[in-house]
Amino acid sequence: RSCYGKRSWLAGCDVSNAFFCFPCLLFQSVGTEVLWTTTGVRDLKHLSEKCKRHESSRSHLDNSMKLTFFGRVSIAEQLDEGYRIGIRRHNEEVTKHRHILSTIIDRVKFCGAFELALRGHDESESSDNPGMFRGWVDFAASLDGALKEHLDRATVFKGTSKTIQNELLDCMLSVTREQIIKEVQTSDFLSIQADETTDIATQPQLLLVLRYIDAKNNVQERFFEFIPLQSATAESVATALKGRLATVLPEDQKSKLICQAYDGATTSAVQRKIQDVYPNAHYIHCYAHQLNLIMQQATSHISKVRIFFSNIGGFSSFFSKSPKRTCFLDEVVAHRLPRSGTVRWNFHSRAISTVFEHRDDLIRCFESIQDSGDFDPNTVREAGALAMLLEDQDFKFFLELYHHITPHVDFLCAKLQEKNIDSVHIKGSIRQFQQEIQKIRNSLHSIGEQSSGSRPTKRRRALSPEDRERIAAEVCDTILGHTRERFSFADHLVCATLLQGDRFEEYKDTFPEDALSSTMKAYPMLSGSKLKTELSLIYSKEEFKACRGAVDLFQLFMENNLEEVFSETVTLLKVVITTPMTTAEAERCFSTSKRIKTFLRNPVTQERLNALAMLSMEKRLVTEMTDFNQRVIEKFAGQNERRATFMFK
């Protein structure tokens, strides 16, 4: 490799096991040595001496010059004064155009980073409200004479049209993705998070987030893409995912993918299809996915359940729109319970429990709103609909059913976040959860009796008690099956306990053999004997007991160049940090998927959604890429036949 680095003309042949001269092979001018074009040099002992003699020969210099000027303007033309002046003027024009384009790129970046609308309703010259982007460009022109002159006089390329904006957004997205792929391919491990969402046209799409440790030893969760889906089936999701992963990980890096996490209802079939191609990609429950919402999604294939959750969301919507409505509800409760403190209404994360526990208060509140005469017609109409809903037998049945189920889901989630966790603890918590759900399933008849005891409403035909029990049994069975699939692999939680500083004192006396065994089973790329030796040394040192978590320990090793000394521990730390597992360690929890879902709630256009989301979510990455604008310009200039010139000669 050092020979090739020193001499760019040197070429090797693995068939003849000899060295040749590439320029001489191509052109073979008069006097070219046969040794370097036909026979080849095999004498490694005297290779350096032969190379020095050959590169000093006239024929080699002639051939090298021919290769250099191959496909270029002739030497005579390049030496012509008129040609030189033309080149200089062309490059001056390119410099000017690149400056203008870079200024426009900066404005697009700003609007994207702060989620501002690029375009207004009227972007004509005389418009008083041309939009944020055009306004920024006009403001920049007032400070930049070159930009102002360009906007006033340009006829070929102005840079402010919708077409140019879209092309720039595409180029910016491409450059940022290329950077993310480069970071992933230089990292040791990769995890993916894929969440099912829908766009404003209700078309299914997949949100893909990549998690890895970058070259600066910082854990990153990067937005990568909204992948459009043909349908929300497992086959469609798996096909789309495998297609994107193939662009991120080449064939020889498939073992890097160590984790996959999903929040949709088709996860079990998807994860098996992905693991067929990426065998190390364990399916886990991700900290970014709320377990209660996942259980809701898992049962949403049942139409009655889907209707119930749509209805329960109506209470949150009703009270979040107006503080006046919430105050009125407080007054109703205060009148009934004058000595009680203020109730903390939570119609979001605890909507089911809140509605179940205060059902009578809510009915009284809605009826009072209808009778008071102090509310607008929309409020009165919505209050009447919600009051009828609270009297509906089917709604009451599912309200009570999920009121019994959700506390156990919350309890399981809390247990899995505890620090003092082991395989026995995990299996015990999951077994206890399954037993509680089974108890609810076995007592469905009592739930049905309570909900059917009240007067029926005339809204629509209610389900029979038998139908309710059948649907509730299906709900319980679905939750039990989903729990088995989601937590079938939990060794990642166990292996994380090997690196908890507050347990090092305990491990010093009794080494955690079971946890090590589970770790080796889950991640066979580790060397068990060396890992045990390294961990034993870490546990015995007082200095390491101040470690607050895996990220702290990893940073300590990397900052002090200990990655070779503690090679297996560092590898384990990379696995643990890259895996988006449920943990109390804040440094490992910064949900990109939640930020993206918040971004989707903003009034953002679907056109160029991927590019706008990338500029918003990855604005720090874009800022850190010092050559970002130049890379965008190069890509923009090479896309089409541009009438304006952007490439130097």
Enumerate the language-model features and the residues they cover.
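Alpha-helical structural modules in large enzymes and assemblies
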Residues: 1-649
